[in-house]
Amino acid sequence: MRNIKMPKRVLQGVVISSKADKTVTVKVERKFKHPIYKKFVKVSKKYAAHDSENKYQEGDKVSIIESRPISKTKTWIVVNGE
């Protein structure tokens, strides 16, 4: 049997905190239609992501990719920003 790797998830969001060393907090928003009420709902979630060069500041739009666990809460890495 072959060992097939699944593609890693990629999310886009906005940096809301860059106070910790080599870590940024990224807020990711998603919109979906409620199945019963048919209204669009906006839900946001915060992810701790690894920023090895400390180059992203609050307000930057970034993409994060899933990775191996880096610490207790960090399992995402910042791959690029705008």
UniProtKB/Swiss-Prot annotation:
Give the source's domain of life in one word: Bacteria
Question: Per UniProt, which keywords does this protein have?
Answer: Ribonucleoprotein, Ribosomal protein, RNA-binding, rRNA-binding
One BP annotation, GO: translation
SUPFAM superfamilies referenced in this protein's UniProt entry, alphabetically: Nucleic acid-binding proteins
* Pfam families noted in UniProt: Ribosomal_S17 (PF00366)
Query: Which GO molecular function annotations are given, in alphabetical order?
Result: rRNA binding; structural constituent of ribosome
The protein's matches in Gene3D superfamilies, at most eight in alphabetical order, are given as:
Nucleic acid-binding proteins (2.40.50.140)
Which residue ranges traverse the bilayer? none
State the InterPro entries in the record: NA-bd_OB-fold, Ribosomal_uS17, Ribosomal_uS17_bact/chlr, Ribosomal_uS17_CS
Q: Which GO terms describe its cellular component?
A: cytosolic small ribosomal subunit
Record's function text: One of the primary rRNA binding proteins, it binds specifically to the 5'-end of 16S ribosomal RNA.
- Return the similarity comment: Belongs to the universal ribosomal protein uS17 family.
How does this chain assemble? Part of the 30S ribosomal subunit.
In terms of NCBIfam families, this protein maps to: PRK05610.1, uS17_bact
Name under which the protein is recorded:
Small ribosomal subunit protein uS17
In its UniProt entry, the species of origin is given as: Rickettsia africae (strain ESF-5)
